[in-house]
């Protein structure tokens, strides 16, 4: 499995619906970019200026919302992941 470093988080991208509520099938270029996913790995965090370690807010298994233009796409073992900085995560879905 991929292990992020620093304040990076690996998110398994949640697939976007390919069909509208009305039954219209969307072309791949018409679909919205995903903005929700599941955290599958969390880095060790960053260090403050005084040397203390800053805790990560998200944990493995959290469902998160993120900005659609952030992160780097990575394909690993036939799955699509996004590598994000923790600051790019907007919210944890409870």
From Swiss-Prot:
GO biological process, any: chaperone cofactor-dependent protein refolding
Gene Ontology cellular-component annotations: cytoplasm
Localization: Cytoplasm
InterPro entries, alphabetized: Chaperonin_GroES, Chaperonin_GroES_sf, Chaprnonin_Cpn10_CS, GroES-like_sf
Keywords tagged on the record: Chaperone, Cytoplasm
GO molecular function, one term: unfolded protein binding
Pfam families xref list: Cpn10
Annotated signal sequence range: none
Record family assignment: Belongs to the GroES chaperonin family.
Xref: PANTHER family: 10 KDA HEAT SHOCK PROTEIN, CO-CHAPERONIN GROES
Function: Together with the chaperonin GroEL, plays an essential role in assisting protein folding. The GroEL-GroES system forms a nano-cage that allows encapsulation of the non-native substrate proteins and provides a physical environment optimized to promote and accelerate protein folding. GroES binds to the apical surface of the GroEL ring, thereby capping the opening of the GroEL channel.
Protein name as it appears in the record: Co-chaperonin GroES
Native source species: Lactobacillus delbrueckii subsp. bulgaricus (strain ATCC 11842 / DSM 20081 / BCRC 10696 / JCM 1002 / NBRC 13953 / NCIMB 11778 / NCTC 12712 / WDCM 00102 / Lb 14)
Gene: groES
């Amino acid at each position: 499995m991929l292990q992020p470093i620093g304040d990076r988080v690996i998110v398994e991208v949640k697939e976007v619906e390919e069909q509208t509520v009305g039954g219209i099938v969307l072309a791949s270029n018409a679909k919205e970019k995903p903005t929700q996913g599941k955290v599958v790995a969390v880095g060790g965090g960053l260090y403050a200026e005084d040397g203390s370690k800053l805790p990560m807010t998200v944990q493995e298994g959290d469902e998160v919302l993120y900005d659609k233009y952030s992160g780097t796409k990575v394909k690993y073992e036939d799955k699509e992941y996004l590598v994000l900085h923790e600051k790019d995560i907007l919210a944890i879905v409870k």
